[in-house]
Amino acid sequence: MRKYDPIIVALDFPEERKALEVAEKIIPYVKNFKVGLELFSVAGPHIVKALKEMGTNVFIDLKLFDIPNTVVRTLDRLLTLDPFMVTLHILGGEEMLRESVKLVSQYKESNKTEYPYLLGVTVLTSFNEETLRRSWGISRSLPEQVLFLAQLAQETGLDGVIASPWEIELLRNNLRRPMLIVTPGIRLTKDKTDDQQRIMTPREALERGSDYLVIGRPITQSSDPYEVIRNIRSQIEDIVESRL
């Protein structure tokens, strides 16, 4: 069992060297790191191994989305890296989800571990109501679509979902049983959105029921990332302590 810490730092960099430099600076203060598609595409499994050797927990965020056989084979390779979390798109469908859950469950049982958490992506935080309709042709409202996908994730056995801060309360109030909610779109102030549409501060997200916060640019692009982390921890300390 790893000590609970809701902060996950997103290493969204186009090169391995820069990602490791940033990680080395803040490892004394945070242990959870996210490797996304951009970094994995240039550094591959090596970046995960390098971070693991530094004593970190690695969230592999590739949002797998393909035919079931391809996703399962890819997931099987990712499991050799001992990840903390792995993501796939819930839109991949019930068969893809169930086969992925089956594989990960077998891995957990064989290795006597509760990790990785298998997480389903609901609706990307860059989407809003208009882009949901225009890009996907879906008539449901954005909250309805998030809930629909989260319910499918729960029915097929996933450990949790990726959902924006705006949908946390909706999920907590409507899912049949608790599941992990991992929240991107975290900003220290609401006046800096970048390419994110549905954002919230760290404390607000935890108060609404998020379990983990994915925070990238506010930390990694700061001239003093330690100070940013310290400020975040001071804001959420009481909430974290209540969950230990």
From Swiss-Prot:
The keyword DNA damage does not apply. SMART domains: OMPdecase. The active site is at K63. It catalyses: orotidine 5'-phosphate + H(+) = UMP + CO2. Substrate binds at residues 12, 34, 61-70, 125, 187, 196, 216-217. It comes from the Bacteria. Its EC number is 4.1.1.23. Pathway: Pyrimidine metabolism; UMP biosynthesis via de novo pathway; UMP from orotate: step 2/2. Catalyzes the decarboxylation of orotidine 5'-monophosphate (OMP) to uridine 5'-monophosphate (UMP). PANTHER family: OROTIDINE 5'-PHOSPHATE DECARBOXYLASE. Belongs to the OMP decarboxylase family. Type 1 subfamily. This is Orotidine 5'-phosphate decarboxylase.
